């Protein structure tokens, strides 16, 4: 036993580098032995994590349009509880807890990027559109199941064949947390403390409104004049959760996102006002009656500039598919070979290489697609067979093709570009469904539910490759991770549906209190297409050309385009958090000390995210119950913004100082 415990103290030295010819990677848990993995302990804790983090991620995602990855905080909690319970050989159990629990973030990302658009459009069409829990739950559930089934044939390629070729940033961080199980106590303390600080901070803002959530340059007369005359404005969200998110995203990626945002807010919006100030540009939206010069910067963003970002995101998704074509071909070839192989070949496969069989995947995929077809036919398409068949072909084709794009993005940057790919799906679905005769509010619902299924499938595919890579490094049994991922999907889909209903009834997606930027973008794309007004193809085209140019210049087009349609105040804090990350990891000449400080900061940032998001859900539940303690008159006072800036500075100071203190 002692010998085995010594063996489990660190990853092999070849875990992160490419293997030499003939070299084999041997994971921590030996492929020739059996370890505790799936049992009552791991399953119950996995379910608890899925519920907890689904609620938190749904709130934060709808609030700021960014979903934090739950894998790291869940891994920390799993290590902490197994250590507290003094469980022996808990590594395999912790992987299962993490795998079931991490369904939360991916299901949330899939659901909240599309389905709130149903509520947004319901405001405009209250009689024609009704949104039910069943629609949200079933589209999230079936999309998640499709994502799991479509990804499994690609597992071997991404986690084993390409060993050392992809950085897998999030999987690396999560694996290190799980490996350092003996650090459970010391890691849990800063996470818990930061969770309390971040939670209280965001709770005070959301529940009591002691200071403003955003700081803007409109706080002074000169800033007000700049916004009105030159259409120049600067904004920053001062929340703890978004600051933590920026730290984990890192300075490089956050800077690219923010660059996209600044290009829109400081170049395109003022430029449009300068060039077309006296014009009424309403070719794509007859409801626009004001001249561009008479609009506030926020209105120019909403009606025009955001569409350029939408076009850029869609093109970035297409570029991703083109780059992944060889991966798709090789995985399909491997799957076909196994389908034609002999049954007894399975017995010789090592424990750490066992997947669900291709026959189960094929049958499961067919059953899931049949269920999606029935859901579309009876609920979404109102019994129209042609519309249903066209919809299922689109959903199945796009979900499968984009699976590799999602997995590839996660493997390289740890960020799933699912919203851009879903936007392309919605544009394509809307154009095709209009061509086969489905228009108006019914067409909007159909396109959004189709988008919801695709978005959740792609989000799941991207997130699940992280879990499988963690399992590969540690020596888990893939088939167990794959089988129990379905349970996490069911629990997360149900939780997200409930949270979305509560948030809509409490705040409403059109109130401005929930940014839901992706869902608003989806609604903005679909409505003109389905009403025969036509879409702003010129603006989409400008965005698409920009994405091609960015890709040519080796700049991540998707990150830049995302920044273009996510509000400025939510992108600036990402850079602030990223800058804190850079600062704490570059102060010393000792690389090991810098790495240690970076890990400490990741723990604190995870605490900010989890605490801030969870207390955001509590605050929303209080509002839902009729408790509203916010003084709106104070929040409209400029001093509430000044106070917000002061509180934000203290929070940043704490994050820097606490991250630098590693002993």
PLM regions and their residue ranges:
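Alpha-helical multipass membrane-protein architecture
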Residues: 1-663
């Amino acid at each position: 036993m002692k010998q085995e415990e010594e063996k489990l103290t660190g990853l092999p030295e070849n875990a992160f580098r490419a293997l030499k010819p003939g070299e084999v990677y041997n994971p921590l848990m030996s492929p020739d032995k059996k370890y505790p993995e799936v049992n009552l302990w791991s399953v119950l804790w996995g379910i608890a994590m899925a519920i907890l983090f689904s609620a938190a991620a749904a709130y934060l995602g709808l609030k700021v349009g960014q979903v934090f990855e739950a894998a790291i905080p869940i891994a920390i909690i799993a290590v902490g509880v197994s250590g507290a319970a003094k469980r022996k050989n808990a590594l395999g159990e912790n992987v299962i807890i993490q795998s079931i629990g991490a369904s939360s973030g991916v299901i949330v990302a899939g659901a909240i990027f599309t389905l709130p658009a149903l509520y947004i459009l319901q405001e405009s069409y209250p009689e024609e559109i009704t949104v039910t829990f069943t629609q949200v739950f079933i589209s999230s559930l079936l999309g998640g199941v499709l994502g799991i089934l479509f990804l499994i044939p690609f597992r071997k390629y991404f986690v084993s064949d390409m060993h050392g070729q992809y950085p897998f940033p999030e999987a690396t961080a999560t694996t290190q947390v799980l490996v350092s199980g003996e650090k459970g106590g010391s890691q849990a303390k800063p996470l818990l403390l930061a969770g309390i600080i971040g939670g209280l901070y965001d709770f005070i803002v959301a529940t009591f409104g002691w200071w403003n959530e955003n700081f803007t340059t409109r706080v002074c007369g000169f800033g007000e004049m700049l916004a009105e005359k030159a259409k120049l404005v600067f904004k920053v969200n001062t929340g703890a959760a978004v600051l933590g998110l920026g730290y984990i995203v890192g300075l490089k990626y956050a800077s690219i996102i923010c660059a996209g945002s600044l290009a829109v807010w400081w170049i395109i919006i003022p430029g449009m006002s300068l060039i077309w100030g006296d014009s009424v540009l309403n070719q794509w939206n007859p409801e626009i009656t004001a001249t561009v010069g008479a609009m506030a910067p926020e209105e120019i963003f909403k009606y025009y500039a955001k569409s350029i970002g939408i076009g850029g995101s869609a093109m970035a998704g297409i570029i991703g598919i083109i780059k992944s074509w060889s991966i798709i071909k090789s995985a399909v070839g491997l799957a076909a070979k196994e389908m034609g192989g002999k049954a007894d070949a399975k017995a010789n496969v090592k424990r750490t290489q066992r997947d669900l069989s291709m026959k189960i995947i094929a049958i499961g995929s067919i059953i899931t697609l049949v269920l999606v077809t029935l859901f579309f036919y009876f609920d979404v398409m109102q019994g129209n067979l042609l519309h249903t068949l066209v919809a299922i072909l689109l959903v199945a084709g796009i979900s499968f093709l984009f699976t590799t794009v999602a997995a590839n993005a996660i493997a390289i940057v740890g960020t799933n570009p699912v919203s851009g790919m879903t936007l392309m799906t919605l544009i394509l679905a809307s154009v095709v469904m209009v061509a086969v005769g489905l228009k108006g509010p019914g067409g909007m619902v159909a396109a959004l539910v189709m988008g919801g299924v695709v978005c959740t499938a792609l989000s799941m595919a991207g997130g699940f490759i992280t879990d499988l890579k963690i399992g590969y490094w540690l020596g888990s049994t893939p088939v167990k991770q794959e089988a129990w991922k379905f349970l996490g999907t069911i629990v997360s889909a149900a939780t997200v549906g409930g949270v979305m209903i509560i948030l809509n009834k409490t705040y409403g997606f059109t109130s401005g209190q929930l940014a839901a930027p992706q869902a608003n973008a989806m609604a903005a794309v679909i409505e003109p297409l389905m009403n025969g007004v036509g879409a702003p193809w010129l603006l989409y085209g400008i965005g698409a050309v920009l994405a091609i140019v960015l890709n040519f210049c080796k700049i991540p087009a998707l990150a830049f385009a995302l920044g273009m349609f996510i509000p400025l105040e939510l992108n600036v804090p990402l850079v602030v958090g990223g800058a804190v990350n850079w600062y704490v990891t570059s102060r010393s000449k000792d690389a090991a000390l810098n790495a240690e400080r970076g890990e400490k900061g990741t723990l604190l940032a995870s605490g900010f995210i989890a605490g801030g998001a969870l207390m955001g859900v509590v605050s929303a539940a209080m509002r839902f119950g009729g408790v509203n303690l916010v003084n709106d008159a104070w929040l409209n006072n400029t001093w509430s913004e000044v106070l917000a800036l002061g509180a934000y500075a203290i929070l940043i100071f704490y994050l820097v100082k606490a991250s630098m203190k590693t002993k």
